[in-house]
Amino acid sequence: MKIHEYQGKEILRKFGVAVPRGKPVFSVDDAVKAAEELGGPVWVVKAQIHAGGRGKGGGVKVAKSLDQVREYSEQILGMQLVTHQTGPEGQKVNRLLIEEGADIKKELYVGLVIDRVSQKIVVMASSEGGMDVEEVAEKTPELIHKIAVDPATGLKDAEADELATKIGVPAASLPQARAILQGLYKAFWETDASLAEINPLILTGDGKVIALDAKFNFDSNALFRHPEIVAYRDLDEEDPAEVEASKFDLAYISLDGNIGCLVNGAGLAMATMDTIKLFGGEPANFLDVGGGATTEKVTEAFKIMLKNPNLTAILVNIFGGIMRCDVIAEGVIAASKAVSLKVPLVVRMKGTNEDLGKKMLAESGLPIIAADSMEEAAQKVVAAAAGKA
């Protein structure tokens, strides 16, 4: 789960991380009012969407008068903001963050992720923060410094100081940088985050260290113990199909192709998509119905896939372990009838009650294309999607 920058800063503030004063707003008039309350002479008008690269996309503007605050708010609020993370369609800006300006002397970068190899949280930092940190990581990886943190001790003072020194924080500002690094680590740990970034972390002209941005992603499997994080969820920022799928415990991710995939098991789902691409097709989605799929879940899965206007065929690929093939067959038949299926449907089943499932499909009277192997299923669905079946 992702949250907005201003929400991330609320979390950072709770953990003692210095952030600029700011106010989230939903209208142009409120933006001007917020700027008046914050006081000038400089403000930053920032689009709030769940994507990076807002500055390059025109979603962050520095205003030097209240008239400019109004002008920039009118420009940004309601725009389709296109960044390298949104795709060509962009994301609509429904809210802004009006923030006090800062005297930026140097931009740094700090981020935390989980390293699954070492099974530790890794703190990354660079002296080259700002909008082009991805380019820095790609072209000059030696400028990215890392520390794997022992979970038994947390981020120690010496580790924080070493990292801060490597990225150019002067000695006089080390206590502030240490507090920010340790606060960010503690926030990451206590909220079950999967990613946390401050980009940029700035040094000001008078030696202050301030988090000028905040990005958090959270482990969705841990949200049950963080109702305060769930309260930050903004459904307007999420794919409507993915939101609908989550209501039925379906793991669904929209993709850019035209072949719908309904599979049980994440590994098999990824292998299925790879095989479709191997034979020249493009998956329209990732969809894992899990091991406890019911007729209702399969029907809802079909409904969600069919809302995609680009869909031209569907592949159902089932390995019957915990999930019985006859249950899936029953669901496929019911779903096909319920939605009046008009696109070609390829079904491949292996495992528990496989013969019964195949018999049910064959006797259903529906124009279902059967396949015995994943390769055959992929070839058939690619051909069907192209109108060659």
Curated annotation (Swiss-Prot):
Family recorded in the similarity comment: Belongs to the succinate/malate CoA ligase beta subunit family.
EC nos: 6.2.1.5
Statement: the UniProt record of this protein carries the keyword Ligase: yes
InterPro entries associated with the record: ATP-grasp, ATP-grasp_succ-CoA_synth-type, ATP_grasp_subdomain_1, Succ-CoA_synthase_bsu_CS, SUCC_ACL_C, Succ_CoA_ligase-like_bsu, Succinyl-CoA_synth-like
This protein's pathway: Carbohydrate metabolism; tricarboxylic acid cycle; succinate from succinyl-CoA (ligase route): step 1/1
Quaternary data: Heterotetramer of two alpha and two beta subunits.
Recorded superkingdom: Bacteria
Residue ranges annotated for the ATP-grasp domain, each copy included: 9-244
Reactions listed under catalytic activity: succinate + ATP + CoA = succinyl-CoA + ADP + phosphate; GTP + succinate + CoA = succinyl-CoA + GDP + phosphate
Necessary cofactors: Mg(2+)
Residues reported to bind Mg(2+): 199, 213
Binding residue positions for substrate: 264, 321-323
One Pfam family per UniProt: Ligase_CoA
Free-text function comment from the UniProt entry: Succinyl-CoA synthetase functions in the citric acid cycle (TCA), coupling the hydrolysis of succinyl-CoA to the synthesis of either ATP or GTP and thus represents the only step of substrate-level phosphorylation in the TCA. The beta subunit provides nucleotide specificity of the enzyme and binds the substrate succinate, while the binding sites for coenzyme A and phosphate are found in the alpha subunit.
Keywords annotated in UniProt: ATP-binding, Ligase, Magnesium, Metal-binding, Nucleotide-binding, Tricarboxylic acid cycle
Protein name stated in the entry: Succinate--CoA ligase [ADP-forming] subunit beta
Classification via PROSITE patterns: ATP_GRASP (PS50975), SUCCINYL_COA_LIG_3 (PS01217)
Cofactor binding comment, as recorded: Binds 1 Mg(2+) ion per subunit.
Binding-site residues, ATP: 46, 53-55, 99, 102, 107
Cellular component, GO annotation: cytosol; succinate-CoA ligase complex
UniProt organism field: Paraburkholderia phytofirmans (strain DSM 17436 / LMG 22146 / PsJN)
GO terms (BP aspect): succinyl-CoA metabolic process; tricarboxylic acid cycle
Keyword Metal-binding: yes
Segment forming the signal sequence: none
Enzyme class: ligase
